[in-house]
Amino acid sequence: MFDTPEDIGLSLEREKIHRVRNLVYTHWHPDHTMGCRVLEQLNMDWLKPRARKVTNVWLPGWVRRDFHKHLGLESHFQHFEKLGIAKVREISEGEALHIDGITLRAFHMAQPGLTSFLLRHGRRRALLALDDTRDWRPGPELSEPDILVIEMGWFERDTKNRRIVSPGDPIRQGEASFEETLRLIGQIRPRLAFLTHIEGLWARSYNDYLKLEREYHDHHLRVAYDGLRVAF
């Protein structure tokens, strides 16, 4: 499992997942970490302490350092370790991590503390770049994956051509636009690109996004949704 947004418990229930052996974090931002207490719900049995389960929590070194600085995350996970329901482990950039037949490698991105992950299963490869891809320059080892999962990026205008991101808006300096995402997809050249981190701020319906898929069919786009399953 990658990251723990605040609604992660609902997602796991929907997919009927009741055991998570490995949890990987991409960065410290609250929308990716503030559901971490799900580990208590998954692993702790207060009436039968011996029945508790353990989840390995994998953190790239730079993410671990941010956990020490932000949101009390390091304290949270120290608490989970004391309860015996988590084991925090650090990984370095490019280090091969083998989990259930899948090899994962972490790569530092341009924005502070952000991580992309390359997954390999047999000859199949998936690249995850889930947030803050602005100024990211993926190396050649990340090119031509079978699957790319990447943030949608922001839109300057809504579907009626009304401006929703003003020229001086800070989002322009801190976040990648949809056009920047398209350029990244063109550089990476995946077989399929799944767009995620979709915000209601962009004032688009799912049907609007389906139109976007058709408009940019040459980029092999798919717009993600809750419950989407991808064979890998």
Model segments located where?
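Cap/insert and terminal regions of metallo-dependent hydrolase folds
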Residues: 135-228
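Binuclear metal-dependent hydrolase catalytic cores
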Residues: 1-129, 135-138, 204-232
